Amino acid sequence: MAGVSAVSKVSSLVCDLSSTSGLIRRTANPHPNVWGYDLVHSLKSPYIDSSYRERAEVLVSEIKAMLNPAITGDGESMITPSAYDTAWVARVPAIDGSARPQFPQTVDWILKNQLKDGSWGIQSHFLLSDRLLATLSCVLVLLKWNVGDLQVEQGIEFIKSNLELVKDETDQDSLVTDFEIIFPSLLREAQSLRLGLPYDLPYIHLLQTKRQERLAKLSREEIYAVPSPLLYSLEGIQDIVEWERIMEVQSQDGSFLSSPASTACVFMHTGDAKCLEFLNSVMIKFGNFVPCLYPVDLLERLLIVDNIVRLGIYRHFEKEIKEALDYVYRHWNERGIGWGRLNPIADLETTALGFRLLRLHRYNVSPAIFDNFKDANGKFICSTGQFNKDVASMLNLYRASQLAFPGENILDEAKSFATKYLREALEKSETSSAWNNKQNLSQEIKYALKTSWHASVPRVEAKRYCQVYRPDYARIAKCVYKLPYVNNEKFLELGKLDFNIIQSIHQEEMKNVTSWFRDSGLPLFTFARERPLEFYFLVAAGTYEPQYAKCRFLFTKVACLQTVLDDMYDTYGTLDELKLFTEAVRRWDLSFTENLPDYMKLCYQIYYDIVHEVAWEAEKEQGRELVSFFRKGWEDYLLGYYEEAEWLAAEYVPTLDEYIKNGITSIGQRILLLSGVLIMDGQLLSQEALEKVDYPGRRVLTELNSLISRLADDTKTYKAEKARGELASSIECYMKDHPECTEEEALDHIYSILEPAVKELTREFLKPDDVPFACKKMLFEETRVTMVIFKDGDGFGVSKLEVKDHIKECLIEPLPL
């Protein structure tokens, strides 16, 4: 169906674009293309080799096998040992009354797992408060069972040598959870056994004072009324607990807030059968040690999904993601969720992460859930006493708030609160401990505050996360612990490899794009901007999957054509010429081009060929006639251009409503998006489904994309356009409607239109319907990248701006393996 090649007609259509009848014509191309043909064709990625794809396939299979036990059914969590909790379980005496431990294997584990420096803990991560708590706990249990004299001696020496140094972690908010509650209690026990430790250090007295202050604020009755975070550390407040009453807040699984240490302590005071049942179940699961939390099935699943999504490898694990999120959703409730399905206390980090991931995957979740995390004055609560945990909670709340739909005011409140908190936390983290630096805490906060989710580049996001993702990442509770299913070398290797493989595919496509562009005839229009790579980036940064190569290619062709038409209507063509060209488009008749000037004849031929090609490919993919659909779309689009040309010629500034109504069409986003989405391999869009994302005049995805693109463009280009004599922009139109307002006030008004439009776009994208999600995603991701392009300036007009760096990151520079 495609027409005669435009290039074959170049010789017969003699186009002298530098001079036409003595007219003085303007150009829209003050900034040349920075991505030359030779540069693009010099790119040679080794990752195009099949051996890398084969390795990626092996990794995908290995990860699927690894994740299967974690997400199937109730799952089998993998979590590192807690020497501290294991020591508490090792304290439990045999229930048959014999003078031996009920769980002797835990004592053996402690004897065999002391580190070379005399401490206990995770060897790969040193946090002194963690080591001190675990080491003193292990020393005390070995003394109880009168074993391990050498280990006891080495443990005491470690504590004596390091006890004073823990003050540094206190100053920097890097202590393990409830350290000031538990450690003084253990020290009192050690002192009663006459262990030779420096009990009179000023820091120890300070710690004891902090413990007393915290307990003084505690309502003793509330401990027994509703589950509270202190249930996690009951072993640290044995002196005040009424053991019979504490059973009223026991968890369904027999534990106290999923803590083996706390549960073991309660069992030793009460002999409760459910406590023992919980301890037995944990020992059966882990063998000869216990973790600091169990189960962590909800948090673990969410973190697995989050890492897979953020590393950009989610297309390989759609089944696993669905299973994990279905499981979380089954346990979702209006009060929020904890780290485990049986945890009676909602956790802000887990709830916010769950909300974001469930909403992103189109589950029905309400933001009203965050009301549970406000105090009596309506302010958000975030104070667990553990800095890293609080920051993780706020980061997740901040990210969740960016998925707001219209009218969800609580998410606006959450965003405001989290932003303020994170800015303050950033100052603190930059001067805090090496632990926070090792965990990339400052980087995470900075990036979150700098980069809005709606104005971010999906492939750059994946690359950045590969650069900060830590396979050995450790979390902090009462001890330092790791979740190997969540952070591991396989995820990182696949993330990097997959990024580079995709990039190598894109580089081959870029060569095809630049070759086509060079031969298309479009470079002959020297008045127009040449941005083939920027337009390829616009689609490839979001719709990057290999199977959508044709979608990317035709999208880029259309965008390149649109740029010539845009610059022709805006700057180069006379009003009489533009009227003829618009009529030629309306007639869809090549013979009518005889009335056009030579440069427009060539332009019309290229236009005719590209529209035919796109319509033909769309018809093949969708199985129905679409030429008339595309013809009407292009006609509307160019009529919008022509109306703006008339405004310019008449020096007319329309009302803002007039401007926006026309601008939604003349921005050209609708026809551009349709030229991609209808050609996505394997994605059938019935007419009914298509109308749910594309219906002129209705606020659906293409309409909202067009509105956002038009206004985002205006906020960064209106000054340059005004200098060229183009008077109509949303800012100028608003100032005409409101002569009393300043330019800054006009800009603020435009942003006040943009913000709710972005929320509407998010809702349209994420609401469940029968539209193929890949199609909605393509439309949505293109909007995100467009907002990036106009974030700091006119990224299309001046291709040397930040967009250049994004293109390099996304399409040029691979990740080192």
From Swiss-Prot:
Q: Does the keyword Magnesium apply?
A: yes
Provide the domain comment.
Answer: The Asp-Asp-Xaa-Xaa-Asp/Glu (DDXXD/E) motif is important for the catalytic activity, presumably through binding to Mg(2+).
Q: What is the effect of changing D713A?
A: Abolishes catalytic activity
Instruction: Give its localization.
Output: Cytoplasm
**E.C. code:** 4.2.3.38
Q: Does the keyword Nucleus apply?
A: no
Position of sequence motif DDXXD motif: 566-570
* Record PANTHER family: (E,E)-GERANYLLINALOOL SYNTHASE (PTHR31739:SF25), ENT-COPALYL DIPHOSPHATE SYNTHASE, CHLOROPLASTIC (PTHR31739)
Q: Give residues annotated as binding Mg(2+) 3.
A: D713, T717, E721
- Recorded protein name is Alpha-bisabolene synthase
Q: How is the cofactor bound?
A: Binds 3 divalent metal cations per subunit. Can use either Mg(2+) or Mn(2+).
Organism the protein comes from = Abies grandis (Grand fir)
**What reaction does this catalyse?**
(2E,6E)-farnesyl diphosphate = (E,R)-alpha-bisabolene + diphosphate
Where this protein primarily resides, as one coarse class? cytoplasm
Q: What does the miscellaneous comment read?
A: The conserved 25-Arg-Arg-26 motif may play a role in the isomerization step of the terpenoid cyclization reaction sequence.
Cofactor(s) needed: Mg(2+); Mn(2+); K(+)
Q: In which pathway does it act?
A: Terpene metabolism; oleoresin biosynthesis
Keywords of the record: Cytoplasm, Lyase, Magnesium, Manganese, Metal-binding
**What is a single Pfam family found in this protein's UniProt entry?**
Terpene_synth_C
